[in-house]
Each structure stands twice: as structure tokens, then as C-alpha cells.
């Protein structure tokens, strides 16, 4: 008489990184693939000089904008497609340095930054449950889903100013390190060495132009990777490397790891592969051009809630 109550739920995903912030609505319903709506990513302005304080302020501002955008999208979707339930949960993913795995404790460590987000969430979505996760957890979960037979690998997650290295053995994370290098580092190198604008520098990365400045940027990135990886490996390097970066830069960073200076890290050789949206798209329904990191977050959130870990 009254109809069957839908058990579908809408989750807000907030992806906080050190070069951008993204948000998306995730619809979860029994028997259906998780579905993303209203994905949007806000880039943090590229700084000429790096400052932890100014970066944190810029990221917090972008996070506030992302929450406002998500609330507006949720309102429009409820108006035009009433089947989408109201947001019942907020899941926040934080990349280094905001959220990092603590392998000794078996749980992530989170920075106390972004204190203003909690009241912002309440003002826009009400008193809904909120959970925090390290983005590294979502990245590893997605790697296992896309490449279930790769039990020993190194995952390099490239971000704006800080990159993360995760070493997997028997499909478990056994090592974690960070490197103070990312997309921002490369763009600044191209701007200063080649006199390019930020737009030109991004285009050069997308086109893979082999300029002197581009080679210098790749060599610098490879050097920082080598320094972090050498301490992480302990002489047990895996030749299977996966690179996670925002498109269209993933292939550029993957190619940079073919630099000759890295040969000693992988004496047995190996492969370097970019994790692309196409590797994850079969697991998550979406509209338009998918965002690799949001796909990872959606896949992890769906699995976490299904197994009761998302509370």
C-alpha cells in the first residue's frame, strides 16, 4: 500500500589533496554498481614558492568551495530526479601530508588542519556522520581491484606538491614514504627554465614534448623518487611500478621513471604502468570524463560501507 522503502543512499565524497580538492555525490543501492554524480575538482593556485601554511589555507578554501558546489548539485538532482536520496553521510579522503598510513598502529594519521570543515559540513548537509580516510587506502584498494594478480608492486601517487610511495607485498602495504615533489614542482621547472606560462607548461606535459626544460623536470622528479624509494625498498625493489596521477599527466610521470638514473633501483628490470580511469571505470558508473581519484574513492567507500567499515 505504501510501497517499498528504498534502501539506496547518497554519500558525499570529499577528496582533499595537496594540489586540488574534489567532490562528488555517490549513490549506493543494493544490486547496483556505485554511481558518481556531480564530480568537480578545484585546483589550488600554483605557487611560485612553496609554503606549508599558504598551501594549507589554499586547500581549505578549495575544500569549502567543493562542499558548496556539492550541496548545490545535490539540491538540483533532488529537484530534477527525486529518486536521489538526501546526503546521509560524508566521507573525506586526505592525501599526504594531511592523511598518511601509520603501519605500526594499523590506522592512518591525520593532521589537525581544516578545522573549519566540520561546521561547514553541518551548515550545508546537517548533522550527518562524517568519516576520515587516507587517500592511500583508496589507492591501494583500487589497485587490488584493477590488478588482482599483482601481489608485489610499488604504487606511486603523484599529487600537487607531495607524492606518496606505497610498497605492497602479498597484496598488503608494507612500506610508505613521501617525496617533496609533484605536479607543481614540474610546472615551476618548466616555467622558470623555459619561460613558459602555466598553461603552456601543462600543454607541454600533455604533449610529451622532449625539450631541455622537460628533460630537466623529469630528471629532477626521478631523482626525488629515487631518494625516497631507496630508503623504502631496503634493497628489495619491486619491478612492478604503478603511477597514479591526475590526467593527462599520468603518462608523463610514468615516462619519467624510465630515467637512466633509476636503473640501479630495478636491477631485474620491470614495468611502469599508469593507472588510468579506464582501469577503474568498469567498477563505478559515472557521467562524462571520469576522475581517477574519485573513482578510487567511490570504489573504496562502496566496499567500506558494504563491510561495515565506513562508520
Q: Where does each model-flagged region fall?
A:
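Nucleotide-binding motor/catalytic cores of P-loop/tubulin-like NTPases across gene-expression machines
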Residues: 254-294
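Nucleotide/phosphate-binding catalytic cleft detector across ATP-hydrolyzing
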Residues: 1-18, 24-35, 41-153, 170-174, ...
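Metal-dependent catalytic core segments for phosphate chemistry
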Residues: 26, 30-38, 180-203
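Short, acidic/turn-prone active-site loops that include or flank metal/cofactor-
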Residues: 136-138, 179-184, 271
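A mobile "lid/hinge" subdomain adjacent to the ATP/sugar-phosphate binding pocket shared
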Residues: 191-227, 248
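Glycine-rich phosphate-binding loop of actin/hexokinase-like ATP-binding domains
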Residues: 152-189
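Generic beta-strand/beta-sheet core signal
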Residues: 168, 244-246, 275-277
Amino acid at each position: 500500500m505504501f510501497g517499498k522503502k528504498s534502501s539506496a543512499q547518497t554519500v558525499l565524497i570529499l577528496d582533499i589533496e595537496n594540489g586540488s580538492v574534489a567532490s562528488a555525490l555517490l549513490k549506493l543501492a543494493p544490486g547496483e554498481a556505485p554511481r558518481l554524480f556531480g564530480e568537480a575538482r578545484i585546483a589550488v593556485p600554483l605557487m611560485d614558492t612553496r609554503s606549508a601554511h599558504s598551501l594549507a589555507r589554499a586547500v581549505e578554501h578549495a575544500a569549502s568551495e567543493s562542499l558548496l558546489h556539492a550541496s548545490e548539485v545535490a539540491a538540483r538532482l533532488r529537484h530534477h530526479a527525486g529518486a536521489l536520496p538526501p546526503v546521509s553521510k560524508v566521507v573525506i579522503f586526505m592525501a599526504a601530508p594531511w592523511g598518511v598510513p601509520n603501519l605500526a598502529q594499523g590506522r592512518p594519521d591525520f593532521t589537525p588542519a581544516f578545522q573549519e570543515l566540520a561546521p561547514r559540513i553541518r551548515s550545508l548537509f546537517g548533522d550527518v556522520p562524517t568519516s576520515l580516510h587516507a587517500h592511500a587506502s583508496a589507492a591501494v584498494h583500487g589497485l587490488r581491484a584493477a590488478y588482482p594478480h599483482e601481489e608485489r608492486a610499488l604504487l606511486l601517487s603523484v599529487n600537487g606538491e607531495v607524492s606518496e610511495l606505497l610498497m605492497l607485498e602479498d597484496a598488503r602495504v608494507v612500506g610508505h614514504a613521501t617525496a617533496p615533489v609533484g605536479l607543481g614542482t614540474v610546472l615551476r621547472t618548466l616555467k622558470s627554465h623555459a619561460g613558459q606560462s602555466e598553461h603552456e607548461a601543462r600543454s607541454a606535459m600533455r604533449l610529451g614534448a622532449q625539450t631541455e626544460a622537460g628533460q630537466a623536470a623529469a630528471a629532477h622528479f626521478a631523482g626525488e623518487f629515487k631518494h625516497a624509494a631507496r630508503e623504502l625498498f631496503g634493497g628489495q625493489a619491486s619491478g612492478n611500478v604503478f603511477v597514479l596521477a591526475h590526467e593527462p599527466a599520468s603518462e608523463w610521470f610514468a615516462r619519467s621513471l624510465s630515467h637512466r638514473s633509476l636503473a640501479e633501483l630495478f636491477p631485474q628490470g620491470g614495468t611502469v604502468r599508469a593507472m588510468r580511469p579506464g582501469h577503474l571505470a568498469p567498477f563505478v558508473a559515472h557521467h562524462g570524463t571520469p576522475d581517477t581519484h574519485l573513482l578510487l574513492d567511490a570504489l573504496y567507500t562502496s566496499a567500506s560501507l558494504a563491510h561495515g567499515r565506513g562508520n
